[in-house]
Swiss-Prot record:
The UniProt record lists the keyword Disulfide bond: yes
Domain C-type lysozyme, first and last residues per copy: 1-129
Known partners and oligomeric status: Monomer.
Similarity section: Belongs to the glycosyl hydrolase 22 family.
Chain's role: Lysozymes have primarily a bacteriolytic function; those in tissues and body fluids are associated with the monocyte-macrophage system and enhance the activity of immunoagents.
Domain of life: Eukaryota
Designated name of the protein: Lysozyme C-1
Gene3D superfamilies for this protein: 1.10.530.10
Disulphide bonds in the chain: 6-127, 30-115, 65-81, 77-95
Name of the top EC class for this enzyme: hydrolase
Length: 129
């Protein structure tokens, strides 16, 4: 599922991400825009680590989810990677909360590249929240 921006903003807010660990809703929207284009089915393979990033938050199979094929995987969120690509993003959000609790928002490269030190207010502009 490719979320519409405001629909995703409302969903993330409902699931408790607004200001979770001090990260604003606008920052989460920016992160998911640049990681996946708001697409729950997004996947990207990383040849160097033989791992794959899954779902709207592009959660990595080496550290956070189990896809059954990544060498030396840790499965820190105790979730199958396929569950991170469901249209219902509850499990993906739970894992994102776990990641930001352990490593902070800088765990996401796209956030560092595209959102840090940027005005991200436009990501929630015009949304009825």
């Amino acid at each position: 599922k490719v979320f519409e921006r405001c629909e995703l903003a409302r969903t993330l807010k409902k699931l408790g991400l607004d200001d979770y660990k001090g990260v604003s809703l606008a920052n989460w929207l920016c992160l998911t825009k640049w990681e996946s284009g708001y697409n729950t089915k997004a996947t990207n393979y990383n040849p160097g680590s033989e791992s794959t990033d899954y779902g709207i938050f592009q959660i990595n199979s080496k550290f956070w989810c189990n896809d059954g094929k990544t060498p030396d995987a840790v499965d820190g969120c105790h979730v199958s990677c396929s569950e991170l690509m469901e249209n219902d993003i509850e499990k993906a959000v739970a894992c994102a909360k776990h990641i930001v609790s352990e490593q902070g928002i800088t765990a996401w490269v796209a956030w560092k590249s595209h959102c840090r030190d940027h005005d991200v207010s436009s990501y929630v502009e015009g949304c009825t929240l």
